[in-house]
Every structure is written in structure tokens, then in C-alpha cells.
Amino acid sequence: MKIVFAGTPEFAAQAVRAIHAAGHEIVLAFTQPDRRAGRGMHLQASPVKEFALQKNIPILQPETLRRTSADPQKKAQAEEAYKSLSAIEFDAMVVVAYGLILPQEILDITEKPGRHGSFNIHASLLPRWRGAAPIQRAIEAGDAKTGVCIMQMDAGLDTGDTVLVVELDIARDETSASLHDRLAGLGADLIVNALDVLQQGKTMIRSPQAIKGITYAEKILKSEAEIDWTLSAQEIDQRIRAFNPFPGASSKLNGYAIKLWNSRLADSQAFSMVGGAGDVLEFGRDGAYIQCGEGVLEVLEMQKPGGKKMAAKACIQPIGAGEKLLHFQLKE
């Protein structure tokens, strides 16, 4: 089939690679404009754009798809996108972590007679965790399960009917990085399955989302990553794993900011000394045991400013037990 693809990060790139490998023709790729990133702040293409360039797929990078924009440049980009999509022959549109809302007039083009509409890969069990950061929010909340939904898109925020749903257990030591990779692979497989069903002329059953259980996965802010040690050990552990790799949980040690990358719950009954929230109680083989508002957390991996990730014991032990990890304010 001929597919229009819209996506930006690596999660989306896995899907477009799988669609291409399955023999479908990507006739047009939408992706976000190049962004400055890295230490040199050089312009970098998105993973989806890099793939499209390799395969000579036409690319559009509008800043908005809304032709009503008051910004003349953005409005012109949206006009170009609308005209290009209207002129091209395609069977379906696939949208994965694109970063722009598709207005109804764009969806209408994909739903013209002979076309199958627009499909989205969403990394949660809808209607739980609609929105921008479903992977991180699921771990932060301590969810035991998540999954992937293939959704027939409508104009709402992740409100469309689901056509395929697969559940996945969240491992006890899961980070957003590891869960991202598992869900990206699952999503890529599912969208290929969905397109194969459509190509065979079969009808996929559309299931409206439940009215109950709706939650929203708001975009992750850097300020959320600062650890408040008066929280319970379980809450802090979930945050450390949720914010790995971005933005990285943060605390303050001996006057400088550090990143916390990995942790696990400890048996608080095993410690003879009890400190205040944020106190370093003692050291294990690799980790440092930190008193929390409730319970004890073993922090396993840290990173000093400008340094590499290292075992927390190696990071803190030169300072000694009794040091305090502090809550501090990060700027956005």
C-alpha cells in the first residue's frame, strides 16, 4: 500500500522502518523541523527525516498544520502541507509521535473514498495516559501494565477508536529507556499487522475508548526531575526510573548538582541508624542507602556534572556517610 507517514523521534523511526521493510511504499513523510541539539547546538534532523533521506522519500517539515495560523510563514507551510497531501495518491496515513495536532481538514483528506484514514501508534492502554509522555507517566505512577494501541484517529487528543491493543507488563526495574525500546518494537509490529489486514481487504473492528479511567500524560518538565527526599522511597524510585533518560532525576550533593540514574527499594528494617530525609545512611557493594520520608532507597548509579555515569558508592563514599542529598530548584 501507499502510506503517508508522520513522525519524529526514534520511536516513530522504528515504525517507518518496519512499514518500509514490509513492502509498503512511503510516498510522503511529515516530521518536525530540524532542532538544535548537543553540546555544539548544531541543527539535527529527526530520526524519521534521516530515514526518509536514505530512502529518497519526499519530506515536509511544517511548524504547524493549521492554515489559520496568524504567522505568515507558518501559514504558508501549512498551506503547502495541505496541498501536497491533497495532490498525492495514498491509501492510509500513519502518525507516530509526530508532535503536531492533525486538524480535521487533514484527517478529512485521509478519509476520502478509497482510503483507510489515519492510524496512530500510542504507547499506553488508552484511555489511560493520553498525551505526550505515556511511557514516563506509567512508570512514575507505578503502573504494573502498559501496552500499545493502534488507534483510528479523530480530531481529539488520543480519543479515537482503537483497532488493535496489546498489553505489556512493566518490569520492577523498568526505566523509561528500556520500556521505550520494548514498546517501540511492539508498536512497529502492530502497525504492520494493521496495514496487512487493510491490504487484504478485511475490516478491523473499531472499539470506542472507555469513558472511565481517562488520565493525561503531560509533557515532562525539567523541574519535575528534582528529587524531594521527603517523599517515600517507592515514589522516589519510580521517579528516578521514569526520568531515565530524560531529563534525569537530580539532587544536590556537597554543593553541586548530580544526576540519579538507577535505584531500588531497600529493606529499611535492616538499618541500625535512622537519619533525616536525604541522609546517606551507609554503603552497599555498589550503591548508597538514602533515608527517604518513608523507607530507604538504594541509589545505584549517579553522575557528577561533566562526568560519566558511575556507581553511587564511588560517587559518594569519598565524602562519607552522613552527607545529605538536598532538594533544590531547577530552572526550566
UniProtKB/Swiss-Prot annotation:
(6S)-5,6,7,8-tetrahydrofolate binds at S124, L125, L126, P127. InterPro entries: Fmt, Formyl_trans_C, Formyl_trans_C_sf, Formyl_transf_N, Formyl_transf_N_sf, Formyl_transferase-like_C_sf, GART_AS, Met-tRNA-FMT_C. Its EC number is 2.1.2.9. Signal peptide: none annotated. It catalyses: L-methionyl-tRNA(fMet) + (6R)-10-formyltetrahydrofolate = N-formyl-L-methionyl-tRNA(fMet) + (6S)-5,6,7,8-tetrahydrofolate + H(+). GO terms for molecular function: methionyl-tRNA formyltransferase activity. Keywords: Protein biosynthesis, Transferase. It comes from the Bacteria. HAMAP family: Formyl_trans. This is Methionyl-tRNA formyltransferase. It comes from Polynucleobacter necessarius subsp. necessarius (strain STIR1).
